[in-house]
Curated annotation (Swiss-Prot):
Similarity-based family: Belongs to the UPF0161 family.
The keyword Protein biosynthesis is assigned to this record: no
SMART domains: Haemolytic
Major place of residence: membrane
Signal peptide start and end residues: none
Its job: Could be involved in insertion of integral membrane proteins into the membrane.
GO cellular component: plasma membrane
Membrane topology of the entry: Peripheral membrane protein
Localization (cell): Cell inner membrane
Organism this protein belongs to: Helicobacter pylori (strain HPAG1)
Keyword Transferase: no
PANTHER family, alphabetized: MEMBRANE PROTEIN INSERTION EFFICIENCY FACTOR-RELATED
Pfam families xref list: YidD
Protein name: Putative membrane protein insertion efficiency factor
Length: 118
């Protein structure tokens, strides 16, 4: 399910966000009004979205983080095709994978999911 279309661009954005978290955000007090934080929101979104469309959603999220916004819980959303039952269970006996994210369907449509990290 992860984004493999442009791994180089995703890797650059992910490395820059992780650098921000490690070197800048660690030395400032926690001030994000949302859960997940804006940097975690960006990392989660980069796993599932095209990096350019993810950057648009990340920019909207950062612009909404201001004193006039009350904040709260705002999970990132993505649009995915639901795999057929045969596709989702074909490697069941061979490969056990660790669950990293839950994709919870939204009420908006059948292809839009909330991304929630386990």
């Amino acid at each position: 399910m992860r984004n493999n279309k442009t791994p180089f661009l995703s890797a650059i954005f992910t490395a820059s966000i992780r650098g921000y978290q490690r070197f800048f955000s660690a030395f400032t007090p926690s001030s994000c009004r949302f859960y997940p934080t804006c940097s975690n929101y960006a990392l989660w979104l980069l796993c599932f979205e095209n990096p350019l469309s993810a950057m648009g959603k990340i920019a909207i999220r950062i612009l909404s983080c201001n004193p006039f916004c009350s904040g709260g819980i705002a999970y990132p959303t993505t649009r995915l095709k639901r795999p057929s039952l045969l596709q989702s269970h074909k490697d069941f006996n061979r490969n056990f994978k660790t669950i990293t994210f839950w994709l919870v369907p939204t009420t908006k449509s059948r292809t839009t999911y909330y991304i929630i990290k386990v």
